Every structure is written in C-alpha cells, then in structure tokens.
Amino acid sequence: MGSLFDGIGGFPLAAERCGIKPLWASEIEPFPIEVTKHHFPDMIHVGDITLLNGAELPPVDIICGGSPCQDLSVAGARAGLAGARSGLFMEQIRIVKEMRQAEIERGHTGVNIRPRYMVWENVPGAFSSGEPKGEDFRIVLDEIVHVVCPSSHVNQWFSYGWQQVGWHYEDNKCSLAWRCLDAQYWGVAQRRKRIFLVADFAGPTAPLLLFDALPNQEVKNES
C-alpha cells in the first residue's frame, strides 16, 4: 500500500493490522513524518505529492489518501475542488493513472495492473460542496471512474443531494462504493463523521469490500 497525504500514518496503521504492507508514504509536515518513521521504520517517505511521478514510485496494490478537506468542509469557505488544498485530490488521481500506465507498459493486464484499488477519505461536506449542490462529489466519482473508463460519466442521482451510502458499477470494468462513518462507533471518544470511498479498477468488488456484502442489484444506485 502507498499512502498519500499520510499525516501520522492512519492508513498504514490500518493496513498493517490487516496484514497489508505499507510500502511508501507522501507527507510534507516534519512532525507527522517523524511519528511515522518511529512506528513504520521500513516505510519509504517520498515527499511532496505535487513533485511525485506515479510511474517512478514503487508499484503498490492499493493507493490510499485523505486529500485536504478545508475547501470542502461546511466550516470553511467552501471553495470546493477549485480550492488550492482540496484540489490536491486531482494529484492523487494523476499518480494512480501514471502508475497504472507504467504497469501497462511493463506488460501487465487486467487485475495485475497496479494499483488495482484506491481508497479516498474526506469530510461529509463533499456531499454538498460545489454548484449545483453536490457537484464536487460527482466530480470525484467521475474522475475515479475515468481512470479506466475515460468516456464514462457519473450523474448525480438525487436532486436533494447525495446519500451517505452508495455505489456505482461500470459494467465489469470497475466499481466504487462509499459510506459515511462516525468515529464514535469505532473506538474514538468523539463524534467525527468521514466519507470512506473504495474503488476497484478491475472488477465489481468495491461494494463487497466496503459493505462486506454485494448490494441488492435491484436497488443499487447507478447513473
């Protein structure tokens, strides 16, 4: 696993507990880097995300990232993905594309193209940010689907906004699923809701991974 916007290593900690090796991390703040160096001494620190080339990074099966949330948060100025901080989400997409293209050029195909999976975490304000309301989250879904299906388009399904749980299939080419989780139910003594989105770039397993079950095909939310 590779961790972008790594902070103090939340994704590497979760990965390690699940038997997944955190191979490298991108972070620019000195103190968080020292924290992760202490807890994950074998993890490579690759530096500023804007200076990275996905084709040159060690290939990983999963790329995780919680891109800066300030421009999406209801507590901020709501600049959305056009903001300098939350707009860094596009750097995560760029790196995924660059790594996958390099893998294709090495002769890998199908499920063997890395990264197969991407995980994105952010604030629930992403559901309502943008114009029209919720457009930023639609763009997030669009950009993730475009990694493998560049001509596809994800529509906003509900005029009153996005649901806190949803999924999308692009034939058998890729799938993505998201859910809003509250830290108070996961061993943390505070209320802290966050969106967690999983994408599978080679199959239909994203809902299975995030929900531990495939959604009912008759009621799935598809564009």
Task: Give names to the regions the model predicted.
Residues V60-G66:
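Short SAM/SAH-binding signature in class I
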Residues G10, A14-K21, H39:
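A short, Lys/Arg-enriched amphipathic alpha-helix followed by its capping loop at the start of a domain
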Residues A25-S26:
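The conserved SAM/SAH-binding core of class I Rossmann-like methyltransferase domains
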Residues H45-L52:
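Glycine-rich, highly charged phosphate/nucleotide-binding loops
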Residues S3-G9:
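Class I SAM-dependent methyltransferase "Motif I" SAM/SAH-binding loop
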Residues E34-H45:
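Short, conserved SAM-binding/catalytic segment
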Residues L52-V60, L72-S223:
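Class I S-adenosyl-L-methionine
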Residues E29-P30:
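Conserved SAM/SAH-binding beta-strand->alpha-helix loop
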